[in-house]
Amino acid sequence: MTARPKKPSPQDGFFWKTKTLEQLSPTEWESLCDGCARCCLEKLEDEDTGRIYFTHVGCRLLDGDACACRDYPNRSDRVPDCVRLTPKEVRELTWLPPSCAYKLVADGRDLYWWHPLISGDPNTVHEAGVSVRGRVERTETEIPVEELEDHIVSWPALLPKRAKLKQRPR
């Protein structure tokens, strides 16, 4: 029995469908980030199981309203444990959210309707409920590390229903 032919995608021909992550230019790489800022939330790892838990506590450099780093060019110097994604890490990290465009592209999947490269609008990531806007309670500098467990939330690891739609709701 032969495999069913792959259904054509309306995104075929775009750079994220024609190149591997390793082949992307720096500009293309950066444009894949949808601006959700979920990766900028503090995470806890269970030492026994390795399971990752998200919190609603942002990195000290996260602007929760803008869903952007306050010092992106210098983030690694200012926050030593800030993860700078690489193609290798995209394929290995288990905590990237299901909506992460880097992960989608690595898996050969299409970007969602709300991704700015598809919608042409950087606000659709917020409209779809994917971003952290309005959901960051505090930053890591305001919460003692021993209290982070009290701030565990599940939503960053989930995809909101409206984000799963095939197109922008009218």
UniProtKB/Swiss-Prot annotation:
Xref: Pfam families: CxxCxxCC (PF03692)
Domain of life from the UniProt record: Bacteria
Disulphide bridges: none
NCBIfam families: PRK05170.1-5, PRK05170.2-5
HAMAP family given in the database record: UPF0260
Record-stated family: Belongs to the UPF0260 family.
Protein name: UPF0260 protein Rpal_2074
Organism: Rhodopseudomonas palustris (strain TIE-1)
